[in-house]
Design a protein with these regions (language model features):
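A structural signal for well-ordered alpha-helical scaffolds and beta->alpha junctions
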Residues: 6, 41, 45, 193-197, ...
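A general alpha-helix detector
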Residues: 33, 124, 196-200, 213, ...
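C-terminal accessory regions
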Residues: 192-233
Length: 308
């Protein structure tokens, strides 16, 4: 039994267990009481603070790194929001203290890695935030689904910045270096990384309804929820005031800037050539379908091409 298994994972489970014609009971992943929003922003921490100020009750902020959980908890405490970090680097006693403080109301927010929630059932979490782009939809649905288990209205806000794309690009570059003499292996590994990541990008930027997008990721269908940021605005979420959201063109520009900085850090002699390439790309920014260098350097930008 699992709460989040798409069709591919279901096939894998059946194959691993050697089952023949098993009876499958699949329930809808749709959560009508959970309102989803996505927001690309250059000011992730500010957006987290504003979301917490706007939404009362218990909250969890999922972070990619342990160090980020610690620094963010410190930042929230300085802002007057009681918080504590939770990650696998803490011993069992320390993790238990955080959970007990959370349950008792001594802290309002847990900043956590994916380790939080395993074996912990807290029904009255009102807000789940992600300060990064998840690498696949299964992880996102598992983590965001920890909100509103009591059936009351709850919220899930996914924040992401171009630094997320740089991390993905860096991972692809590592694969290319590690398997430079095995192009077929290189291609297969990059595609394995890219496919689930692309689904998350399309969910964030192109889903007409985020709840529908989650259902579709699991091979299901649902009606528009009417409550998510896509249903309310027809575009990427705008509901947090005074946090400048990023347009798709700005995302392009920032990704390219980060890419140039990374190349220069590794080899300063490449800077001029990269600048020339960036100028050429910037001149055609209004024509993303014809973006020079996209196929060579930025294949992951393909997810943006049909977004207005």
């Amino acid at each position: 039994m699992t709460a989040t298994a798409d069709k591919q994972l279901q096939r894998g489970i059946v194959q691993s267990l050697g089952l023949r014609h098993p009876k499958r009971i699949v329930m809808p992943v749709e959560r009508p009481n959970l309102h989803y929003s996505v927001l690309p922003t250059a000011h992730v921490t500010d957006a987290i603070l504003r979301a917490l100020q706007k939404t009362p009750g218990k909250a969890v902020v999922f972070c990619r790194l342990r160090a980020r959980t610690e620094s963010l908890a410190e930042r929230l405490n300085r802002a007057g929001i009681p918080a504590a970090a939770y990650h696998a680097g803490l011993n069992r006693e320390e993790r238990s203290r955080v959970v007990q403080a959370y349950l008792s109301g001594r802290i309002r927010v847990v900043t956590a890695t994916s380790a939080f929630g395993m074996g912990v059932d807290i029904p009255d979490i009102r807000l789940i935030l992600h300060d990064h782009l998840p690498t696949n939809m299964i992880d996102y649905v598992q983590q965001s689904g920890r909100a509103g288990r009591d059936g009351e209205t709850a919220y899930a806000l996914l924040l992401f910045s171009p630094a997320d794309f740089l991390r993905f690009h860096t991972r692809c570059q590592q694969i290319r270096v590690q398997h430079k003499h095995r192009p077929f292996t290189q291609y297969a590994l990059i595609q394995r990384e890219w496919r689930p990541y692309r689904r998350v990008l399309r969910f964030c930027l192109q889903a007409p309804c985020l709840s529908q997008g989650i259902s579709a990721a699991f091979g299901q269908q649902s009606a528009p929820c009417g409550n998510c940021s896509a249903c309310r605005s027809g575009a990427i979420g705008k509901e947090i005031p005074n946090i400048p959201r990023m347009t798709v063109q700005e995302l392009y520009c920032w990704i390219l800037q980060l890419h140039r900085d990374e190349l220069h850090r590794r080899n300063p002699h490449q800077k001029q050539a990269t600048n020339a390439q960036l100028r050429e790309i910037a001149e055609t920014m209004q024509l993303p379908d014809n973006l020079p260098g996209r196929e060579t350097y930025f294949p992951y930008l393909r997810a943006f091409q049909s977004h207005p």
